[in-house]
Regions:
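Transmembrane beta-strand segments that form the barrel wall of outer-membrane beta-barrel proteins
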Residues: 192, 211-212, 230, 265, ...
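Acidic (Asp/Glu) and glycine-rich low-complexity loops/linkers
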Residues: 20-34, 50-191, 197-203, 207-210, ...
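Structural recognition of beta-strand segments within beta-rich domains
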Residues: 32, 39-42, 188, 300-302
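Short, surface-exposed interaction patches in beta-rich subdomains
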Residues: 234-243, 247-381
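Bacterial Sec-dependent N-terminal signal peptides
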Residues: 1-26
Length: 381
């Protein structure tokens, strides 16, 4: 009898595994050289970039269906428009999918379970005091992350309770789009409602213009880099060089940054370590600066309605704050500065370093209508 039961279980597991089907959308390869550029224009696509082991770019795009339904396959492929072409040294990838294929909000749990989890998430979020984080801790967060904080909360919950039944999400299919890219390739990206992940370090120029796209990078290293992101998620282990415009980006995690200019607005940004030649121009964002490199020298920030959070590492960093109409919270002690009679900016705060032996550099702030909090390093992740 036991042998019969085991046979049934074995047959069921085989049927489940074989119920998945893989349908090819696009499969192409092209030879490239140092002058080749890849132009990408995509909507509602999930793409994973990997480093190619030769000079060819390879594109492999499929849809994996969790159950074999002709009606579902027809509905999905009706919403896919994908083509790729090459003209001289330019490769153009154009994928315009319907919103039905979008995976930004796919949480892979039952709706009732999701309702409970999101309630717990917001309770814990309110309790979060954003303690100090090391650069290594932030890098681990980036590596673990699937996208939004809610995605990561559910992933962590599943890891903590592996045997708990959380049901299944509404999606009955997933996109699998892998692009193997030579390191010498220049890349331009225009994206909408997409997920784009790079699994290799980028040293060639990359230009990105995106709306509601979740980006995840390793190292981005080029002075010609240009990013213009509106909403979505932006996570990267390291930035060296480039210009970055971030507007309404509700999750930005940067392991370390140097030689870069950032123009930010109504975003939430966490940086593990700030290095040399970093300039910020911000409006109404929350900015968490956890650490400064030992040789960062000078950090410049101009802000209006900005909320800045620094973490006090005694006798390593000097700070000067010019402006007006700004509140300060230093080691839980509060002070505020009203505007001057003539409306001009003035020196609101100056923090000097007595011991120059451990001196990292100087922070220069120009801020109005802001909040600057220098938090004690009570806890460290």
């Amino acid at each position: 009898m036991k042998q019969f039961i085991y046979s049934i279980i074995f047959l069921i597991s085989i049927n489940i595994s074989f119920s998945q089907t893989k349908e090819l959308v696009l499969k192409k390869s092209f030879e490239t050289n140092d002058l080749t550029t890849l132009n990408i224009d995509v909507d509602n696509v999930t793409i994973q970039f990997k480093e190619s082991d030769d000079s060819k770019i390879r594109l492999d795009y499929s849809i994996i269906f969790k159950n074999n339904s002709d009606e579902l396959i027809y509905k999905v492929f009706k919403g896919i428009k994908a083509k790729v072409s090459k003209n001289k040294n330019v490769i153009n990838l154009d994928v315009k999918n319907s919103m039905y294929l979008g995976e930004l909000h796919n949480l892979d749990v039952d709706i009732n379970v999701y309702t409970e989890l999101i309630s717990d998430y917001f309770k814990k979020y309110k309790e979060n005091k954003f303690p100090h984080k090391t650069k290594d801790f932030l890098l681990k967060e980036i590596d673990f992350s699937l996208g939004t904080d809610m995605h990561d909360y559910i992933k962590a919950f599943k890891k903590k309770y592996p045997n708990k039944n959380l049901g299944e999400g509404s999606k009955r299919f997933e996109q699998k789009f892998i692009i193997n890219v030579p390191k010498n390739l220049k890349i331009k990206i225009k994206s909408l409602h997409s997920r784009i992940t790079f699994n290799y370090n980028i040293n060639k120029p990359i230009k990105v213009s995106a709306f509601k796209t979740y980006f995840k990078f390793k190292k981005i290293n080029n002075n010609e880099n240009e990013f213009n992101l509106n909403m979505g998620v932006f996570q990267t282990d390291r930035i060296i060089g480039g210009n970055y415009i971030l507007k309404d980006v509700n999750k930005v995690l940067i392991g370390s940054i140097s030689n870069a200019k950032l123009s930010t607005e109504t975003s939430k940004i966490q940086i593990g370590e700030i290095g040399k030649d970093v300039e910020f121009n911000d409006f109404n964002s929350k900015l968490y600066f956890y650490n400064f490199n030992k040789n960062f020298e000078t950090f410049e920030l101009k802000g209006d309605y900005s909320k800045l959070y620094f973490y006090n590492k005694k006798n390593t960093v000097s700070l000067t704050a010019y402006g007006n109409t700004t509140a300060f919270v230093i080691d839980k002690q509060k002070a505020s500065f009203k505007p001057s009679k003539d409306g001009k900016k003035f020196k609101m705060l100056e923090k000097k370093v007595k011991n120059k032996e451990n001196y990292f550099g100087h922070i220069n702030l120009n801020i109005t209508h802001g909040i600057i909090e220098i938090k004690p390093q009570e806890k460290e992740h």
